[in-house]
Regions:
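N-terminal organellar transit peptides
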Residues: 1-92, 98-200
């Protein structure tokens, strides 16, 4: 199954993404339910991974949380998630990318770990509550990033308060991307007598 996350995660587009994820979740539940009643393994329906393509410069954190949590619901069913990043994978897009069990990207992809921004627009009591939520969300993203890469908290602290842009090579180095396995060429050595047998 496939899901495309393209553009900024804003209300209108993100509702469509969330609705698609709910439909995908229902379809997986249906397949898993059918497979649980199968007597012979040959009759089982193949459970394909969920391929998520991401081309996003970020978005609103509460939309990120909704989509990320729904991806985790699907993953908790035993479904493999494979994320693919192209072009730009920034902020909320990067967090969603980290949901992948396997993570791949185009070589020209630019990644960005975001120094989240807090807008102070309400009265003082609301500001305290909103800021506490902001800190909680920021801590969650930091935890997700650290758990799914080779990056330490100390390394992230070096970039605190500013956006951290990096490319494919550094993404591979820090464990953000799944290394692509290349099959080794096999060398076949045959004796002269085996060669003569083959030629006959």
């Amino acid at each position: 199954m496939n899901l495309d996350i393209k553009g900024q995660l804003v209300w209108e587009d993100s509702i469509e993404i969330f609705n698609q994820l709910e439909e995908i979740e229902k379809e997986y539940k249906s397949i898993l339910d059918a497979n649980s009643r199968v007597v012979y393994e040959n009759d089982m329906i193949e459970v394909e991974p969920l391929n998520v393509t991401i081309l996003s410069n970020g978005g609103v954190s509460w939309i990120l949380n909704a989509v990320y949590d729904k991806l985790m619901d699907i993953k908790s069913m035993g479904i493999e998630i494979i994320t693919h990043a192209y072009g730009v994978c920034a902020s909320a897009g990067l967090c969603l990318f980290l949901a992948g069990d396997k993570r791949y990207a185009g070589e020209g992809t630019v990644f960005m770990y975001h120094a989240e921004q807090y807008a102070n627009i309400q009265d003082d009591i609301n500001n305290v509550i909103e800021f506490a939520q902001f800190v909680k969300e920021n801590d969650r993203f930091e935890k997700i990033f650290i758990e799914n890469t080779n990056v330490t908290k100390e390394m992230l602290d070096e970039h605190k308060g500013r956006d951290w842009y990096f490319g494919y090579d550094l993404a591979m180095k820090i464990g953000l991307l799944t290394p692509i396995e290349v099959e080794e060429e096999k060398e076949y050595i045959i004796t002269e007598s085996e060669c003569i047998k083959v030629m006959r």
